[in-house]
Design a protein with these regions (language model features):
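Small-residue-enriched, tightly packed secondary-structure blocks
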Residues: 23-189
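Bacterial N-terminal signal peptides
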Residues: 9-18
Length: 189
């Protein structure tokens, strides 16, 4: 009985989020992603001032707005964002989806910022997407490059990630069962 109720609640949450997303045109969705990215970067620069120089000298970056829910044993998240090539300023619109297991109840609104040290890492992210699994403790990796990526977690060679919650930069990054991929609808011009 409890599983049936939980399943119905999760389906309802998913359907409501799809209805809310479906109202915007592709142009409106692109503009929302741009505004979200600008605001998120401004917030990050206030919380981690060294991040601005790191992003400025990077090959590129990606910014995502994510909403996660955890209901008893099931956790899910979905989001959208934009990746930018720092040299060419080319924008690529992307999506994120995540699923996992873990005990808890709640909703988490958070932002994820990827910083790509080199073109190879950026191109791999853009062309192959990215799948994350596991957890990383940001405090354990904060000292590389004389603090250039202070507050970030290295998730792959040349790829650093900041996670911002309403309380600031998260000290622990969770990317379990997470997939980032291109949004084909928004990348059509």
């Amino acid at each position: 009985m409890r599983v049936s109720v939980i399943s119905r609640v999760l389906v309802l949450i998913l359907l409501l989020s799809l209805v809310a997303i479906a109202k915007d045109t592709p142009g409106q969705k692109r503009e929302k992603s741009r505004k979200m990215a600008t605001q998120t970067l401004q917030d990050l620069y206030k919380l981690q001032p060294t991040s601005q120089a790191s992003i400025a000298k990077s090959a590129g970056y990606a910014v995502f707005n994510n909403m996660g829910t955890n209901l008893l044993l099931l956790s899910t998240a979905r989001g959208a964002g934009i990746a930018v090539n720092s040299q060419t300023k080319q924008e690529t619109f992307m999506k994120m989806i995540s699923a996992g297991a873990g005990l808890g109840v709640g909703v988490k609104d958070y932002r994820v910022i990827f910083v790509f040290e080199n073109k190879k890492a950026l191109d791999h992210f853009l062309n192959s997407g990215w799948s994350g699994s596991g957890q990383a403790d940001a405090a354990a990796k904060a000292g590389k490059s004389g603090g250039a990526y202070s507050g970030a977690t290295e998730v792959a060679p040349g790829v650093w990630v900041y996670q911002i919650t309403k309380n600031g930069v998260a000290l622990q990054l969770t990317l379990q069962g997470t997939k980032y991929y291109k949004d084909d609808d928004l990348n059509k011009q």
